[in-house]
Regions:
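Non-catalytic peripheral regions of patatin-like phospholipases
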Residues: 5-10, 33, 39-167
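Active-site glycine-rich loop that binds ribose-phosphate moieties when present
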Residues: 12-24, 38-44
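Carboxylate- and glycine-rich phosphate/diphosphate-binding segment that chelates Mg2+/Mn2+
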Residues: 1-6, 24
Length: 167
C-alpha cells in the first residue's frame, strides 16, 4: 500500500525509505511497518495535491524518459526497459487521475468544491536521458553528476523563458 509522508511524518527514515531501491537495500522500518522506494507505486504522488495543496500548478521534473526510440533486443536491454516502465507507470497513473478529475470538473462535478483543476508543467531532458542506460542511475561519478546538474539548470532556464507566464 502507498503511504505518502507529509509534514511531521517526514523524517530521515522516511527519506531513506523513499530512496531505498529494493534490489539494492533492505526496506526501512517506520512505526513497525516496512517501506522502500515509492517509485514502484507512487512516484510522484500527485493525486493528494488535489485535496491538500493551495496551488493549482504542479511542476514535474521528469527524470525517466517516457519515449525511448530503440527497441530493446538483449536480455539486459529488456530488463532496463522493464525498470523504466515500472518507474513511469506510477507517474502515468497519477496523470490519468488528474485528467479524470479535470473531466469531472468540466462536466460540472467538483465534489462540493473539494476538487480543483490542476495545471501540470514538465521540465525534462528526454532527448539526452533516453540515451542513458538504467545503470547511469547508479553512477556517482562527480563529472557525470555535474553534467546532469548543468543539464537540469539549462532545461529549467529554458522552461522558465518559455512558460513563466503560464505558471
Amino acid at each position: 500500500r502507498i503511504r505518502v509522508f507529509t509534514h511531521s511524518d517526514v523524517s530521515v527514515d522516511a527519506v531513506l525509505a523513499s530512496a531505498c531501491l529494493p534490489f539494492l537495500f533492505q526496506a526501512v522500518e517506520i512505526d513497525g511497518e516496512f517501506f522502500w522506494d515509492g517509485g514502484y507505486m507512487g512516484n510522484p504522488p500527485l493525486y493528494p495535491l488535489i485535496y491538500h495543496c493551495d496551488s493549482r500548478d504542479v511542476l514535474i521534473v521528469q527524470l525517466n524518459p517516457i519515449r525511448i526510440p530503440e527497441l530493446p533486443k538483449t536480455a539486459q536491454a529488456i530488463l532496463d526497459r522493464v525498470n523504466t516502465l515500472s518507474f513511469n507507470s506510477s507517474l502515468m497513473r497519477e496523470m490519468r487521475a488528474i485528467h479524470f478529475v479535470t473531466k469531472l470538473i468540466d462536466n460540472g462535478f467538483d465534489d462540493d468544491g473539494r476538487l480543483k483543476r490542476m495545471l501540470l508543467h514538465t521540465v525534462d531532458a528526454e532527448d539526452v536521458l533516453s540515451r542513458l542506460g538504467v545503470s547511469s542511475k547508479l553512477n556517482a561519478d562527480w563529472d557525470f553528476l555535474t553534467t546532469l546538474f548543468n543539464l537540469g539548470r539549462e532545461r529549467a532556464e529554458a522552461f522558465l523563458v518559455q512558460h513563466f507566464d503560464k505558471v
